[in-house]
């Protein structure tokens, strides 16, 4: 194959490459245009078309270069060219050792050294064959001893230099470089932005917002599906009315709120409210998580924030929902070593977009978080989040309404009362109640029932609060100790004024607890008196007191570990937070110590002296000591009733609150806690 072929291969595709002259011909203005038209600057549209045409020509040129390189690699000579005669004359190969043997026997006539002396084409006079053979031998370099021996044997040998085909070498180089060059130039062209180089067109689309956009949202959820959060629901209905009939409010000079921040514990329905307003408002809806702003590349977060609000302004009026905004809206300057600059840059961009120099007319931002205490103060000010709606745990009426929503598609037994379930589930969030009804339905199906009964609902409550039911204990000393422990809790709590009534005592293990004593909690856990707190400590120590009095101090067990931790925490809060001790009404705890943020806790200043710390420990010890003496007194004075209750509990393994009080009333004339005027949350159970 001749070099002419490679030259033609090189020139063929280059003839199709668009040149600058063609480009200028395509964009020549017609002669009929007036002279004044030539003096005008080209429009923005013309500049963009010219920019796109230039990129297209450059891409075509790069593609042609790549195809030319690949075709040249196929058609051209190899970069190395050896003498044709020795190589083409032989296809046989011989080992180096056999070559040396033939050399010693004076059978080697001629040696041609090629490829820098690493290969030899050898002519051997083989008496066995009776003719001269031409073979190829791979040499381990070119040893001096081999050259000396060939001279001694008068062997005709010659070294052939390597001829370099520079045309083929160039085509080979371009062939290897062509594809990476095409890929690189294509990425640069597609990722470049004429107006905003660091804007939404970052490589691989990193700068574009990941928000889900719905022009006509269809979430399947309306305000009828939201219950138990009437105050928050009313605020959202007002925003929807503002979007649908803005003239009603603008006539009075009112402006639509720019932002609404939803705060509250997890599972209370913050995201559900956002889905409801998306289905009711009838305006474009953008939704994303706060964590979707930040990536591993610097500048991506701020770019995505700009892109999000640019799209929102283009579709205004609209709603932007940012879930878990604490992922990006955390207070600035709290990070170790100066903080997370990328997150702070993103937050600064969000602050500017929400209420900066340009403003964001027509864009309503709704955000949700369960950690409002760590949000930046600039994010919370009016003008950005005009309204802060607290979505708390529902009360008994709210729980009943939520249960009605989640029981629409479920078959309930006629004996099931949603109001009773609502009364027995204080402290449950909307998500907890939805999970409760789903667990009850699963349990009823597992048991082969066609309806959900109160038994399945009770078992589901136990499972959600305390965990799955474990293997029942075998009768023996351990089971008796657990029975006395749980009855001790119930006795001490019932006989102490201010405690909550017993709901259930059981020996059925759940989770890590081998036995459980349930109390019927109250509706307002935020207002608790000193007498109630002391009664809780007495009830919590009732299990340890029963073990101590009945079995003796050497037989007390580790089952009271959780109880001791709980009562110690209550006693310390009475001293340091609530001012219910001899020290006086002091708040002795730095609020920053209670923060969930690790950095804030590290930076918290402890202003407490050593003497004051000793006084606090003494007061805590005295409160717990007094409560323990009261608990042991209850156990000693009601030993007969305790033995009876333990016998019944070992037999039935579960006692309801009414059964427990009926047996206890036979042995004592002391008033029992049977009403639920003052109660605690159901999660504040006492377990072993």
Swiss-Prot record:
Molecular function terms from GO: ATP binding; ATP hydrolysis activity; ATP-dependent peptidase activity; metalloendopeptidase activity; zinc ion binding
Transmembrane domains' residue ranges: 169-189
Residues binding ATP, per UniProt: 264-271
Required cofactor names: Zn(2+)
UniProtKB keywords: ATP-binding, Chloroplast, Hydrolase, Membrane, Metal-binding, Metalloprotease, Nucleotide-binding, Plastid, Protease, Thylakoid, Transit peptide, Transmembrane, Transmembrane helix, Zinc
Stromal side: 190-688
Record note on disruption phenotype: No visible phenotype.
Membrane topology field: Single-pass membrane protein
Lumenal, thylakoid face of the membrane: 84-168
GO CC annotation terms, alphabetical: chloroplast thylakoid membrane
Annotated organelle transit peptide span: 1-75, 76-83
Ligand binding (Zn(2+)): 485, 489, 563
A UniProt-annotated Pfam family: AAA
InterPro entries the record matches: AAA+_ATPase (IPR003593), AAA_lid_3 (IPR041569), ATPase_AAA_core (IPR003959), ATPase_AAA_CS (IPR003960), FtsH (IPR005936), P-loop_NTPase (IPR027417), Pept_M41_FtsH_extracell (IPR011546), Peptidase_M41 (IPR000642)
Class in the EC hierarchy, top level: hydrolase
Cell location: Plastid, Chloroplast thylakoid membrane
Region (Disordered) location: 25-44
Active site: 486
Family according to the record: In the N-terminal section; belongs to the AAA ATPase family.
Domain notes: The conserved lumenal (CL) domain (84-162) is present only in some FtsH homologs from organisms performing oxygenic photosynthesis.
Role this protein plays: Probable ATP-dependent zinc metallopeptidase. Involved in the degradation of the light-harvesting complex of photosystem II (LHC II) during senescence or high light acclimation.
Protein name, as recorded: ATP-dependent zinc metalloprotease FTSH 6, chloroplastic
Organism: Arabidopsis thaliana (Mouse-ear cress)
Gene name, Swiss-Prot/TrEMBL: FTSH6
């Amino acid at each position: 194959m001749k070099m002419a072929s490679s030259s033609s291969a090189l020139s063929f595709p280059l003839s199709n490459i668009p040149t600058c002259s063609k480009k200028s011909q395509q964009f020549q203005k017609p002669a009929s245009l007036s002279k004044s038209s030539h003096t005008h600057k080209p429009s923005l549209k013309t500049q963009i078309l010219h920019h796109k045409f230039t990129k297209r020509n450059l891409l075509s040129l790069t593609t042609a270069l790549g195809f030319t390189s690949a075709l040249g690699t196929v058609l051209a000579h190899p970069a190395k060219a050896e003498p044709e005669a020795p190589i083409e004359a032989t296809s046989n190969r011989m080992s180096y050792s056999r070559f040396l043997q033939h050399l010693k026997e004076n059978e080697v006539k001629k040696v041609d050294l090629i490829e820098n002396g690493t290969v030899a084409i050898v002519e051997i006079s083989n008496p066995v064959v009776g003719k001269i053979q031409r073979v190829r031998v791979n040499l381990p370099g070119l040893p001096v001893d081999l050259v000396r021996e060939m001279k001694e044997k008068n062997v005709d040998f010659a070294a052939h230099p390597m001829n370099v085909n520079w045309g083929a070498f160039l085509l080979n180089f371009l062939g290897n470089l062509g594809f990476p060059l095409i890929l690189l130039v294509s990425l640069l062209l597609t990722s470049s932005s004429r107006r905003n180089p660091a804007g939404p067109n970052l490589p691989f689309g990193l700068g574009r917002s990941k928000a889900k956009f719905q022009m006509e949202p269809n979430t399947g959820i309306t305000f009828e599906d939201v219950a138990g959060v009437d105050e928050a629901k009313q605020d959202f209905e007002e925003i929807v009315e503002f979007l649908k009939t803005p003239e009603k409010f603008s006539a009075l000079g009112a402006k639509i709120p720019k932002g609404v921040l939803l705060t509250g514990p997890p599972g209370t329905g913050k995201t559900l409210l956002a889905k409801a307003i998306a289905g009711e408002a009838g305006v474009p809806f953008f939704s994303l998580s706060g964590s979707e702003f930040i990536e591993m590349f610097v500048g991506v977060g701020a770019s995505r924030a700009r892109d999000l609000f640019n799209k929102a302004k283009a579709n205004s009026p609209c709603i932007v929902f940012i879930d878990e905004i604490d992922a990006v809206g955390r207070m600035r300057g709290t990070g170790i070593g100066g903080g997370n600059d990328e997150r702070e840059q993103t937050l600064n961009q969000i602050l500017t977009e929400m209420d900066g120099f340009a403003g964001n007319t027509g864009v309503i931002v709704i955000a949700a978080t369960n950690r409002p205490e760590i949000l930046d103060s600039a994010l919370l000010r009016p003008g950005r989040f005009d309204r802060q709606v607290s979505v708390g745990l529902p009360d008994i009426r709210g729980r009943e309404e939520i249960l009605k929503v989640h029981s629409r598609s479920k078959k309930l037994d006629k004996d099931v009362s949603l109001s009773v379930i609502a009364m027995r589930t204080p402290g449950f969030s909307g998500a907890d109640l939805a999970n409760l009804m789903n667990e009850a339905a699963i349990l009823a199906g597992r048991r082969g029932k066609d309806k959900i009964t109160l038994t399945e609902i009770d078992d589901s409550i136990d499972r959600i609060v305390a965990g799955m039911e474990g293997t029942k204990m075998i009768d023996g000393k351990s089971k008796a100790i657990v029975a006395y422990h749980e009855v001790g809790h119930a006795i001490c709590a019932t006989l102490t004024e201010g405690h909550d009534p017993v709901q259930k005592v059981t020996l059925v293990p759940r989770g890590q607890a081998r036995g459980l004593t349930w109390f019927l909690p109250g509706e307002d856990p935020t207002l608790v008196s000193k007498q109630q707190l002391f009664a809780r400590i007495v009830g919590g120590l009732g299990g340890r007191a029963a073990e101590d009095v009945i079995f003796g101090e050497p037989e007390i067990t580790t089952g009271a570990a959780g109880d001791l931790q709980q009562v110690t925490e209550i006693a310390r809060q009475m001293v340091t937070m609530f001012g219910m001790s001899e020290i006086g009404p002091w708040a002795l705890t730095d609020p920053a110590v209670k923060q969930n943020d690790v950095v804030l806790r590290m930076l918290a200043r402890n202003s407490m002296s050593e003497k004051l710390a000793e006084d606090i420990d003494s007061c805590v010890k005295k409160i717990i000591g007094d409560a323990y003496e009261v608990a042991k007194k209850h156990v000693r004075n009601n030993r007969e009733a305790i033995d009876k209750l333990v016998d019944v509990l070992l037999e039935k393994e579960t006692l309801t609150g009414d059964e427990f009080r009926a047996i206890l009333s036979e042995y004592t004339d002391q008033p029992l806690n049977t009403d639920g005027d003052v109660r605690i949350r159901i999660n504040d159970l006492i377990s072993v």
